[in-house]
């Protein structure tokens, strides 16, 4: 059913015939999957297909986690390698950032007993905070705000208060699209505001995204393109795309 959600995410609507053709399944299987997803309130059934109850970015994070999972794991390891013991790290929400939090938890040097935190993570994602709180040597700071029910991210002015009073060594920000000309973009303007502020409070701001987002744009920009200094992505980025980002001033790390 994840594959059906992926198709739905592309255009916001899907027909049974499309599912049959693209996924090589029977019409009965396609209808059964649509009915099951409708029962979970992930889509609305129509005659001959379905429409999304929300646009692609609003699909619950548990369904987005499986998309490009190997790439996200490699990106997470590359991101973790940039972090030094004792750093203050900003982590916005999203599946790639969640993978980075997992990579932090697997680092032996961050699990060593210490009178001071081996790492401080500032996040607006409650799922990431819940994951890291199990690591006693990692200090977890939550921004505050109102929970976005599908992405688990905290948004709103309460987040601004916390972020406005701290400094961050390195921030990792996931995106819905990145383009050399338009920069980084996300679908939700409230999340964009938090991501942008976190990047501005950081000495180094890093975009983490799989290559499927390259060349795409979403609704809300994350400030000026020069706000970020590094892009970490997977090895499906083309040579032309990499050159375009490097010409725009971004360091590109291929995981």
Regions found by a protein language model. Name each.
Residues 1-17, 21-95, 101-121, 134-137:
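HTH-adjacent hinge/linker in prokaryotic transcriptional regulators
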Residues 3-19, 24-28, 39, 71, ...:
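Conserved phosphate- and dinucleotide-binding cores of soluble alpha/beta proteins
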Residues 100-101, 217:
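Short, Lys/Arg- and Gly-enriched loop/turn segments at beta-strand edges
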């Amino acid at each position: 059913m994840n594959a059906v959600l992926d198709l739905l995410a592309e255009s916001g609507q899907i027909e049974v015939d499309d599912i049959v053709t693209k996924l090589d399944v029977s019409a009965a299987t396609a209808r059964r999957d649509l009915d099951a997803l409708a029962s979970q309130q992930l889509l609305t059934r129509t005659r001959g297909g379905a429409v999304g109850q929300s646009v692609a970015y609003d699909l619950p994070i548990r369904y987005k986690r499986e998309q490009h999972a190997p790439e996200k794991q490699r990106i997470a390891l590359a991101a973790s390698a940039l972090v030094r013991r004792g750093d203050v790290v900003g982590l916005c929400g999203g599946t790639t950032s969640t993978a980075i939090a997992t990579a932090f938890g697997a680092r032996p040097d961050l699990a060593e007993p210490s009178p001071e935190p081996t790492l401080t993570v500032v996040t607006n994602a409650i799922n990431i905070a819940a994951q890291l709180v199990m690591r006693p040597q990692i200090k977890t700071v939550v921004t505050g705000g109102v929970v976005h029910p599908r992405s688990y991210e905290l948004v709103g002015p309460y987040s601004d208060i916390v972020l406005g009073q701290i400094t961050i060594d390195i921030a990792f920000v996931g995106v819905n699209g990145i383009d050399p000309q338009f920069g980084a973009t996300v679908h939700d303007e409230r999340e964009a505001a938090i991501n942008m502020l976190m990047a501005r409070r950081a000495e180094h701001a890093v975009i983490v995204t799989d290559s499927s987002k390259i060349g795409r744009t979403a609704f809300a920009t994350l400030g000026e393109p020069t706000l970020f200094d590094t892009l970490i992505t997977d090895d499906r980025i083309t040579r032309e795309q990499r050159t375009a980002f490097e010409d725009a001033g971004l360091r590109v790390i291929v995981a």
